[in-house]
Regions:
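Terminal alpha-helical segments
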Residues: 1-130
């Protein structure tokens, strides 16, 4: 495995840990943001391994899935699409109070749980060479 791939994996795990800290402190919008970043970086690890090059500077998770040539199970793909859509409104909310209501603690917990599940699957695929 390439050293830059290993770095992407470490960054993804660091970002998931940061999302967990944001959950504890009640910063739920940042849970979504950091969860998205964790998935983005793990997908970039896949792209790095497949292309043997530094991945494009993209935040689009669906693009990265395609670029990596991954056959993602449908429930994981559905979540990737969902968090991909949530990324911009949680990063740049037009109405902070509305965003805080929409992305409540329970929503943040669900996002972080699903992120951890998808990250685990992505890492397993990387380690197995699939």
């Amino acid at each position: 495995m390439r050293s830059d791939t290993e770095n992407w994996i470490a960054l993804a795990e660091y970002d998931l840990d940061t999302a967990q800290h944001m959950l504890v402190t009640g910063r739920y919008l940042y849970v979504i943001f950091m969860s998205h970043l964790a998935l983005e970086k793990m997908l970039k690890a896949h792209v790095t391994e497949v292309t043997q090059a530094i991945p494009a500077k993209s935040h689009d998770l669906i693009y990265l899935v395609k670029k990596a040539g991954l056959d993602v199970p449908q429930p994981h793909l559905d979540f990737i699409g969902k968090i991909n859509t949530a990324s911009i409104p949680t990063r740049y909310p037009e109405d902070l109070q509305r965003a805080l209501k929409e992305y409540s603690e329970s929503v943040a917990r669900e996002y972080i749980s699903q992120t951890a599940e998808v990250l685990q699957w992505l890492k397993r695929m990387l380690m197995s060479g699939e």
